[in-house]
A protein has these predicted regions:
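Short amphipathic helix-loop junctions that connect adjacent transmembrane helices
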Residues: 156-173
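Glycine-rich segments within core transmembrane alpha-helices of 12-TM secondary carriers
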Residues: 51-75, 265-273
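Hydrophobic core of transmembrane alpha-helices in multi-pass small-molecule transporters
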Residues: 6, 17-31, 223-237
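Transmembrane alpha-helices of Major Facilitator/SLC transporters
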Residues: 173-195
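A membrane-interface helix-boundary motif in multi-pass transporters
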Residues: 76-94, 279-299
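C-terminal transmembrane helical hairpin of 12-TM major facilitator-type secondary transporters
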Residues: 199-242
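C-terminal membrane-cytosol helix-exit motif in multi-pass small-molecule transporters
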Residues: 95-113, 303-308
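Cytoplasmic helix-loop-helix junction between adjacent transmembrane helices
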Residues: 20-60
Length: 314
């Protein structure tokens, strides 16, 4: 319901304050991805977890493929003069209402309530399992925060950079983001779901580091799309892999809570990253901003290779 209220405010927004209120409400009520991740862990065992998480990520990438292009197209359809984006907002409202009705009427409960004896048995099994886990939630959460901090900052600066270098408009930006989404969805459906989650994370952070280095120096659109391909690899791997690793470290009874905490650290990074990185971009320029981003991502690479380990049961 919070998402419906958020987009309804966007539909009605004729001034910046109302639009800002819609974003605040949307941020406070955001939880669809976390819900999907929790459901994925409920219906999969340890051996299936990585592939199931990758399936959720693939669905996200497919939406990321068509969403920006559709939004860019609808932004050119002005039905309300005081709110040029009312058409795009109205269609978003239709999608969210449809999703809410589907969740309410069609989605079964996946977290089945167990009897007391079953709970005790599962608690004993969970105790035996968690003693063999290898990665602390603190390390996983910090890795997630650090990665999202730099990745989201770079992500939000891309429209500025593409406009400065190539005079990109909404159509061109939508095409670029659609390319990233297509590549990411293909990778998640073919590569990510077959790899171990730790290797998935390591592949993604190295790819992101390479993308930062290329973005700092690129001068042609071909190089831009090369960097976009690297970012697609990152989008298809890191968050999915970290979610899988985090789920391995939690018992069935606490998995939703642990994944919620894990995602909240990512949201902190998503809050701070765009503000700090885009400020640095405009204050110091592209070269310095992406050099700082590359340095930060190098630290994330060190965490992925030097701190995280493969869970013993996976």
């Amino acid at each position: 319901m919070g998402n419906i209220l958020s987009v309804a405010l966007w539909v009605a927004a004729t001034d910046f304050r109302t639009f800002l209120a819609s974003r605040v409400v949307g941020g406070l009520s955001e939880g669809n991805v976390q819900l999907a991740m929790a459901i994925a862990t409920d219906i999969s065992d340890d051996k299936q977890r990585g592939a199931t998480m990758a399936l959720v990520g693939a669905c996200f990438s497919i939406a990321f493929t068509f969403g920006p292009a559709l939004g860019a197209a609808l932004s050119n359809v002005t039905l309300v003069q005081s709110n040029p984006f009312a058409t795009a907002a109205g269609f978003s409202l239709f999608l969210i209402v449809t999703e809410t009705l589907y969740l309410y009427f069609c989605l079964p409960e996946t977290h089945v309530v167990s009897s007391t004896s079953e709970k005790e048995k599962k608690a004993d099994d969970n105790k035996k399992t968690t003693t063999q886990r290898t990665n602390s939630h603190g390390l996983l959460n910090f890795t997630h925060l650090a990665f999202i901090l730099f990745f989201s900052g770079m992500e939000f600066s891309l429209p500025f950079m593409t406009y400065d270098l190539f005079s990109y408009g909404s159509k061109d930006t939508g095409r670029l983001l659609g390319f990233i989404g297509i590549v990411a969805s293909v990778l998640q459906g073919t590569v990510t779901r077959r790899m171990h989650p730790l290797r998935v994370v390591q592949l993604g952070v190295v790819s992101c580091l390479c993308a930062f280095i290329l973005l700092a120096r690129l001068t042609t659109e071909a190089q831009l799309y090369g960097a976009a391909a690297l970012l697609a690899v990152t989008s298809a791997t890191v968050v999915t892999g970290l979610n899988s690793l985090s789920s391995f470290e939690a018992s069935a009874s606490e998995r939703g809570n642990k994944l919620g905490n894990h995602r909240s650290f990512g949201q902190i990074g998503r809050t701070l990253g765009p503000l700090s990185f885009c400020s640095l971009y405009w204050w110091a320029g592209r070269d310095v901003a992406y050099a700082v981003g590359a340095t930060g991502m190098l630290g994330v690479v060190a965490l992925a290779f030097g701190g995280l380990r493969k869970p013993v049961q996976v």
